[in-house]
Amino acid sequence: MAVIPMVVEQTSKGERSYDIYSRLLKERIIFLNGEVEDHMANLIVAQLLFLEAEDPEKDIYLYINSPGGVVTAGLAIYDTMNFIKPDVATLCTGQACSMGAFLLSGGKKGKRFALPNARVMIHQPLGGARGQATDIQIQAQEILKLKEMLTRKMAEHSGQTFAKVAADTERDNFMSATEAKNYGLIDKVLTSRGEVA
């Protein structure tokens, strides 16, 4: 089990200790680390809604280091990012693969960033089915609908054509931060905090 660091803050009322993620949440920073799954998505959605209630005019920063995960869990985060009033800036630290890359590109245009050595990977959604032939056919139709929708959204976010994104996501497509910028998935590669507009 990972140890989560604690930070101690001095206030007029004495000392207060926070786990590091709670302290950063006060600065409107949310971490999306690890596999995107339902529990994680619920926590991130709750944090987005909380920060919107705190100040609907102030940007929220979503730091992403993820190998991807469950499409529907990622879409819950994506839809909430677009539903709330504050702009959600995205920043890739480490990797943003699959659904992680989709969420990275789904940040507010002009506020999508990656650190210099970050890696981004896009591909078509993965799935598997078993059971009766009819059930497998239903699952196949659903994954094809998701593939079409994700491709369309990624084309909108990147400025690429639907056909190009469809071709580029046929297999795992790895990119450096600079390549992700050139593709349109992010707006800027950051080398220092001062570069965040």
From Swiss-Prot:
Q: Where mainly located? A: cytoplasm
Subcellular localization, per the record? Answer: Cytoplasm
List the catalytic activities from the record: Hydrolysis of proteins to small peptides in the presence of ATP and magnesium. alpha-casein is the usual test substrate. In the absence of ATP, only oligopeptides shorter than five residues are hydrolyzed (such as succinyl-Leu-Tyr-|-NHMec, and Leu-Tyr-Leu-|-Tyr-Trp, in which cleavage of the -Tyr-|-Leu- and -Tyr-|-Trp bonds also occurs)
Which residues does the Swiss-Prot or TrEMBL record annotate as the active site?
S98 (nucleophile), H123
Q: Which PROSITE patterns match?
A: CLP_PROTEASE_HIS (PS00382)
Q: What class of enzyme is it?
A: hydrolase
Q: What does this protein do?
A: Cleaves peptides in various proteins in a process that requires ATP hydrolysis. Has a chymotrypsin-like activity. Plays a major role in the degradation of misfolded proteins.
Write down the NCBIfam families for this protein, in alphabetical order: clpP (TIGR00493), PRK00277.1 (NF001368), PRK12553.1 (NF009205)
Name the chain's protein. ATP-dependent Clp protease proteolytic subunit
The organism is: Haemophilus ducreyi (strain 35000HP / ATCC 700724)
